[in-house]
């Protein structure tokens, strides 16, 4: 049985040491034959570096590594090319000076590797000279592979001015690529984000962005077929250790880890989570182990964001994959490019551009996103969120409003004063998002702001045969009892419960006042009787 390639992104190491390699060379072959300059955006831990490493070995002509793969009999092994691979995870970037020095050191090292002498002094002219000299010395066109091109920018979004300065360094550095067409055989650039104003996307007129092209939607990540064919033995082992039927296991894995897509048709697994699942033989949130992207952390610190994405089922964008502007950071774009949102569907509307439906990929990512944002806004650690949610689940099942109320009070009291001040003008919506997000973490199916014939209810929690209708009220001037009564009356008067009468229906009303909260559970039949008496 081949080994699990955990943490290995070097193609030669996978092949030589009997690790599983999911063959992506068909997409590589098509890409190379159709063009010369490409950009690909994918979230972290999705196989970008392995893809770059595979391209490196292919262009170097290391034929034996590709035996048995799709490309082996199709590639012209009589030609090899000099390769410059620039991995920005190995380039210093704490300020523009360090970035320039690190890039200069990289160029000097490459000059030594290829035994060429450089006389230029500036960074950009030296890079251009390096490419030209390698071409001249070898008599072969040069292949350039740039991995994580955006790291010097998105690692500094907590300091936009510094990020801009690093962007300017990169813009000048990348401009060299435009004037070197005659020296280049192939250029491939990867990153998490697609930043504007870095010259890659404005100056490289012949660049093809394959991020959301259907043809290359499966170039990174594992398909369902990949999972069931390459990892068959590991699936059987997991089925035995978890005592789950094989088909039930596949469904569970799909629900928890599948769902990433860049065309709305082909849905994928993140390799990191799947490999961890097979290694530990436990269903768990491995996405969180990779760490929340600094990009998302910094955005939450510096910008008021629309938290409704936590509870809405869909979000839309039109046209091409959205660019990222340092001057105008957009929360939804961050979530999309970092993998917390994915393309669920593409609606073609000729002659206009496509409309993309965006949503959270799977249960693992949902838990990661909710846990992180709740932790950020309430000062709860990820470790403390899980046990508290389990307790709340018990309180809801038992409809223990006293203990549930205490949990909600704990939640509200943990909100830092600074954040409370920022949201004070829209605190009702903010509280509602926090409470519903917490319920989502409990494993409930949450539907928020559902339109009915008579109006819009705040939220509906469904679990098995239970339907829990939620209504929130916030008013600093009214009493808690008044707000709770108003919420109950609204549910009955507008008939929010009518579509769910085939289920066991309970009502949960929640009233907020400043940082205080009161909640009330009632069975529907009980509330209907009370409503008649109130009238």
Segments from the language model and where they lie:
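Structural signature of nuclease core domains in nucleic-acid processing machines
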Residues: 401-535
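Phosphate-binding site recognition
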Residues: 1-427, 442-443
């Amino acid at each position: 049985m081949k080994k699990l390639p955990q943490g290995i992104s070097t193609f030669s190491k996978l092949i030589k040491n009997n690790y599983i390699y999911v063959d992506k060379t068909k997409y590589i072959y098509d890409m190379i034959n159709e063009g010369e300059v490409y950009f690909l955006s994918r979230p972290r831990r999705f196989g970008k570096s392995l893809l770059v490493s595979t391209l490196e070995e292919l262009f170097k002509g290391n034929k034996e590594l590709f035996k048995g793969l799709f490309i082996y009999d199709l590639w012209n092994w009589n030609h090899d090319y000099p390769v410059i691979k620039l991995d920005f995870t190995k380039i210093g970037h704490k300020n523009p000076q360090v970035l320039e020095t690190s890039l200069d050191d990289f160029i000097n090292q490459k000059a030594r590797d290829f035994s060429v002498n450089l006389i230029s002094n500036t960074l950009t002219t030296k890079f251009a000279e390096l490419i030209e000299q390698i071409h001249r010395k070898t008599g072969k066109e040069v292949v350039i592979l740039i991995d994580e091109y955006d790291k010097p920018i998105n690692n500094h979004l907590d300091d936009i001015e510094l990020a801009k300065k690093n962007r300017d360094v990169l813009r000048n550095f990348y401009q060299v690529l435009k004037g070197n067409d005659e020296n280049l055989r192939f250029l491939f650039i990867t990153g998490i984000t697609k930043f504007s104003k870095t010259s890659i996307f404005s100056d490289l007129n012949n660049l093809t962005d394959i991020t959301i092209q259907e043809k290359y939607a499966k170039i990174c990540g594992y398909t369902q077929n990949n999972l069931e064919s390459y990892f068959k033995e590991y699936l059987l082992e997991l089925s035995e250790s978890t005592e789950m039927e094989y088909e039930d296991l596949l469904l569970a894995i799909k629900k928890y880890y599948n769902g990433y897509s860049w065309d709305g048709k082909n849905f994928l697994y993140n390799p990191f989570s799947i490999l961890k699942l097979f290694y530990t033989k436990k269903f768990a949130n491995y996405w969180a182990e990779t760490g929340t992207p600094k990009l998302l952390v910094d955005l939450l610190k510096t910008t008021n964001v629309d938290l409704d994405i936590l509870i809405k089922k869909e979000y839309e964008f039109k046209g091409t994959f959205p660019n990222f502007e340092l001057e105008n950071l957009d929360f939804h774009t961050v979530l999309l490019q970092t993998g917390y949102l994915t393309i669920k569907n593409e609606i073609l509307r000729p002659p206009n551009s496509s409309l993309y439906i965006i949503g959270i990929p799977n249960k693992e990512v949902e838990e990661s996103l909710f846990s992180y944002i709740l932790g950020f806004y309430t000062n709860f650690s990820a470790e403390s969120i899980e046990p508290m949610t389990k307790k709340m689940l018990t309180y809801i099942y038992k409809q223990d409003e006293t203990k549930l109320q205490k949990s909600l009070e704990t939640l509200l009291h943990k909100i830092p004063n600074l954040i409370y001040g920022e949201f004070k003008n829209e605190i009702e919506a903010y509280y509602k998002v926090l409470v519903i997000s917490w319920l989502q973490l409990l494993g409930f199916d949450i539907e928020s702001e559902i339109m009915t014939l008579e109006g819009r209810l705040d939220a509906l929690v469904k679990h098995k045969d239970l339907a829990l209708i939620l209504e929130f009220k916030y008013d600093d001037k009214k009493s808690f009892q008044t707000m709770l009564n108003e919420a109950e009356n609204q549910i009955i008067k507008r008939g929010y419960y009518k579509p769910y009468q085939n289920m066991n229906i309970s009502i949960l009303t929640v009233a907020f006042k400043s940082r205080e909260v009161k909640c009330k559970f009632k069975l529907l039949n009980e509330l209907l009787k009370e409503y008649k008496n109130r009238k």
